[in-house]
Each structure stands twice: as structure tokens, then as C-alpha cells.
Amino acid sequence: MAANKNKNQSSLALHKVIMVGSGGVGKSALTLQFMYDEFVEDYEPTKADSYRKKVVLDGEEVQIDILDTAGQEDYAAIRDNYFRSGEGFLCVFSITEQESFTATVEFREQILRVKAEEDKIPLLLVGNKSDLEDRRQVSIEEARSKAEEWGVQYVETSAKTRANVDKVFFDLMREVRAKKMSENKDKNGKKSSRNKKSLRERCCIL
């Protein structure tokens, strides 16, 4: 029975999501809220924690693998390895901390550098702690402008109230899925072209 369960899970589509952003912006809180429906306020700084969950995405059962990475500068060197394995990224800042918003530029540049061979990288800009509106330092207009400049979606979340938590993970999975489908289509198209060319060559020889 366990073997069948593992077999079923391994046959599900797996989408790999990486959480990036400065320390203390709530990456772990967002992840834990999505995974377990609970708000964890005090959380030890993360080096890298991995989580996996089975979800239903637009009627299809899939698995999401979430890697929650450290925002601290001490871990900057090892982030490259984590970024290479990622298929989609949630670039998180706190709306109550201007510095964390400014830092998203550097995180995105690191992602683009590591994934330089890829075309469009699935990424969402996420402004967390929307429940702390009275302490806001980053305006919605400023964040939207940055997202528009990057060609990505901007969403505000609250790990505390769970506002838009599911939305950011599911929207990102949709982008990852669309990219995979596009890449598979391109591969199949090239393969088909090679087969036709090979067939024409064989016909000429005959």
C-alpha cells in the first residue's frame, strides 16, 4: 500500500518554489501559514527549510516543493545553489520596511544571474505584513511600479490574517506550469522537425 502511495505521489507534477527576501520579512511565516494554516510570529532565522505539500491546482492534483531560504547576508554565497534548483520565486519584502523593498532588486538580480540561460523566470513580488497598514513605509504605487518594471505580478499578503497567502503560491504555480508546458511544446516541435527532416533525407536517398 505504501509503495502504491509513493508511486502515485511520484507521478504527480512537482512545482519547485523558492522563497527569497531579506531576513524578518515573513518568508517563513508565509510558508508555514500555507503549509499548516497557522501563524508563527517568532521563528528562528532560516538557513534553508524545505516543505512539500499535495494540492489541487485548477482541478489537477500536484505537489508543491517550497524552499524557504535565509535572507541574511551570511548565506548569500550558498543561495546560488538553491536558486538553480528553483522553478518559481516569491520575492518577499515587508511593507513596513523600506530597506527590505530596496533589497528585492539585489535578490532578483541574483536570480537572473543564476538562471541566465532561461527566458522568462516565474516570479511574483510580494509585499507582506499588509495587516500593519498603520506602519506602512512602502506605498502600493511604488511596489506596483517596480513589479511593472520587472514584468511581474505584485500581491500584498498577511501571514497573520492569511490574506492572499494561497493566492501567491497558486498564482506562481500556474506560471511555473505554463512555462513547463511552453518548453515541452518547443521541445516536441523541434523533435518533430528533426523527424521530418530525417524522413525527407531517407526519401532522397531512396
From Swiss-Prot:
Protein name, as recorded: Ras-related protein O-RAL
Species this chain originates from: Diplobatis ommata (Ocellated electric ray)
Catalysed transformations (reactions): GTP + H2O = GDP + phosphate + H(+)
Record GO biological process: signal transduction
Family, similarity comment: Belongs to the small GTPase superfamily. Ras family.
Membrane topology type: Lipid-anchor
CDD domains, per the entry: RalA_RalB
Residue numbers covered by motif Effector region: 43-51
Lineage: Eukaryota, Metazoa, Chordata, Craniata, Vertebrata
GO molecular function: G protein activity; GTP binding
Region (Disordered): 180-206
Extent of Basic and acidic residues compositional bias: 180-189
Compartments in which it is found: Cell membrane
Residues that span the membrane, as ranges: none
